[in-house]
Amino acid sequence: MNPIFNLLPFSLKSLHFLMLLLGYLGLHSQVLTVRDSENLKPLDLVTIYSPKGNVSAVTNAQGQADISAFQDATVIMIQALGYAIENHSFGTLKQKEFILDLAPSQLELDQVVISASKWRQSSAKIPSKIVSISAQSVAFQNPQTAADLLELSGKVFVQKSQQGGGSPMIRGFATNRLLYSVDGVRMNTAIFRSGNIQNVISLDPLSMESTEVLLGPDAVIYGSDAIGGVMSFTTLKPQFSDSDKPLITGGAMTRFSTANREGSVHADVKVGWKNWGFLSSTTLTQYDDLIQGSNGPQDYLRPYYVARYQGQDIIVPHKNPRRQGPSGYGQTNSLHKIHFRPNEHWDLSYALHYSQTTSYSRYDRHLRTKDGSPRYGQWDYGPQSWMMNHLSVNHKKSHGPYSEMALRLALQNFEESRISRAFNEPVRENRTENVAAYSANLDFAKNLSPNSSLYYGVEWVLNDVNSQGENTNILSHISTPGPSRYPQAKWLSYGAYGSLQHQISKALMLQSGLRYNGIKLDATFDTSFYPLPFEKAQIDTGNWTGNFGLVLNPGRQWLLRANYATAFRAPNVDDLGKIFDSEPGAVVVPNHQLKPEYAHSWDLGTAKIINKKLKIDVSTYYTRLKNAMVRRDFSLNGAQFIPYDGELSRVQAIQNAATAYIYGLQAGFELKLPAGFELTSDFNYQKGEEEMNDGNKSPSRHV
């Protein structure tokens, strides 16, 4: 017998009270079940969203979600990958007894995205082009790393200097001109360099709920660095139970790949009650040396490798020149979350992200030679680690200065190092960088009217950079201090923004925003190893950025979008203060006179669905980057060449070029074929030029 009957005397009065109570509970805890219309199986990860009320929910493994908060919503959008989008009112769902069957879709122009404003929005009402990669696509495509995951979009080019690499490029921009966001938290640090970076491999593709790539600037929401685009990663979330019984779900997989003898093991588990949810996800991966394809370039073949024998470096012939050794490495990823939802208004969660690789060799450096012998006996990236503690608080209300609020507090710790030793030289150089990144984001969404929404917020980010150098004699095992790669530095960013979305008419949407961002940098240099003409450098600057865009959507089969946006990137510690060998015979030195670079970007795109079978998408863009920071020849105390790492090297520095121009075209199509097959293709063309000091133009590097 239900315990509630034991608490109430059985009488007409108490029965009336009981009916009111059950009616109240049904009113305030209404569960929607979403199923596949063909096999009636429950659908998980279905997004339920109200465009007018900024209310959202996601179905659990049983295809269920509590939609009590949607009672006042006039339109409820329900979307799942591979299914037709449906719009209903709460009353319509009630008539269906809160059971909804979704039909497999053909093609759609509309989807729910987060990256444009950090809130769930309809992509058909956003003037920027956004590409989404779902967890189902990841499970089907099986990318080994998060860099490979981004390539699934067809819009991101990924450069790799070694197997343990992956440096994305979007619309001609790369490295620190792109912004990485994990669960709404900025991942970029003050030492994200202008050269190729591999920080994205710290993320686990198997723990992603969704990944979005926003093409073009979005500095209004994200601040500095968001010039070429934004990569927004949303990790797995705990699920809640809709009954008194705990909801327990999970999954596991193993994978083996022949090209690099990869062995991966992954497991995740979710345990949820009505108000509490827990999640744990772990992936262990080991990669052996990568085997090059039989039709690969001759320059990348490895006819020999270096081994240590009786205190000497020796050259050992490779039995298989296509084996790119050394290039193997291992990696561990783990994610743990605690989620507490006391009621429909408040939502609190804590997440611990952790990733660490083993040491891995930089393959292109091992291909270099000097006087007929290998240039290096060792050139490794040391273990790359990333840890993030993330606390988020969300609140929803129907009245007041906001409809929904999100507070994100995060502490990230990054460590990376470079270990190198010349061939048959006893001294091994080790340069280690540690960055502690503190951040606080407070974001709001407010429904001003049925046709207007306002998004606004503030951000504060502090990076504490600690850089150390050490030289070790591998014969005597004696270590001495060595030159560091960076100065000791603190980098501060603070900003405030506002963005308005207004439905001008049924077919026309306007979106416009404005942001102010301040940047401060304080660096102290060690001049005991290099004769720098300064010991301290400071930057204190600020920039206004904005955007104005229109979306014309005459119907669900066609849309046009146009957007103008500005963006900026302030010099970070890597731009201003690093000392490193950029290429054979060249050394980059600090330049304390750097200024921010500023971008103006124009974007025009269209998408069309033909006969519900063919989707065509075309976008063109043009970006002008003023004061672009690029590497150029430089002088140090009047000297154009200085000795570095035992070699006389040309002095270079990051400098503000006159202007850089980037333009391009992106096109793609998606064709639905019989029997569930699908054909897709993407085309990307981009060109970048920068003005030299003498007025001539040259191709841009990393732009």
Spans of model-derived segments:
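Outer-membrane beta-barrel signature, preferentially recognizing the C-terminal barrel domain
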Residues: T258, Y376-S398, R485-W491, E535-N553, ...
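N-terminal periplasmic accessory domains that precede
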Residues: K96-D101, A146-L149, G166-M169, S181, ...
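Gram-negative outer-membrane beta-barrel transporters
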Residues: S505-K506, L510, I519, Y621-R624, ...
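Signature of Gram-negative outer-membrane beta-barrel scaffolds
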Residues: L454-W558, A570, F580-E583, D694-G695
